[in-house]
């Protein structure tokens, strides 16, 4: 549905100074619209069966490049550094299947690439969770540590053919700070057992120093991992 695609592009506020990295171009319908607005579009597609189709649909564009590679194996930091020599902003636009949403977002954040923003179409339930300030997980804390997240648009299942079983939504993450790579290990460990206290979960990392470290960070040891604030986790990284 061209109207929906144009609305999606409008939410991203891209311009000719922007280079877009698109994950999963599919048949290239969104890529085409992105190319009209962005300076350059680099698409990553894992499915080589789409080679001929994408060549046909996007071949006439001089500012689109399609790379057939699993995005999770891409050295994103290096690529963004190269692209920023030509473009003032680099952002990611992605259509993320449910089963790989977290993996892709974590890969992007952990790369520490100097992106301006991430715009992703995800399952509606996932979008509502990630933008709910009362819901906490390692991923929501990772996002909060680098910037802000918003739900920018609802996308009905009926605009797709064939229609999927669920509705989707566009989320945007605007990046203001570099990611602290020490957070990844800390958050994963803190959330290993959500029902356990932060003290019990972090003992694996800090051992006999756990009590002292929590005191230094002014964190009550009987708190659950989701009850902490991102500032608490950032304080804890200093002891790793």
Predicted regions and their residues:
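Catalytic cores of RNA-modifying enzymes
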Residues: 1-189
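Hydrophobic, well-ordered secondary-structure scaffolds
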Residues: 8-11, 67-68, 97-99, 215-220, ...
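An accessory alpha-helical subdomain
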Residues: 169-175, 179-212, 217-232, 237
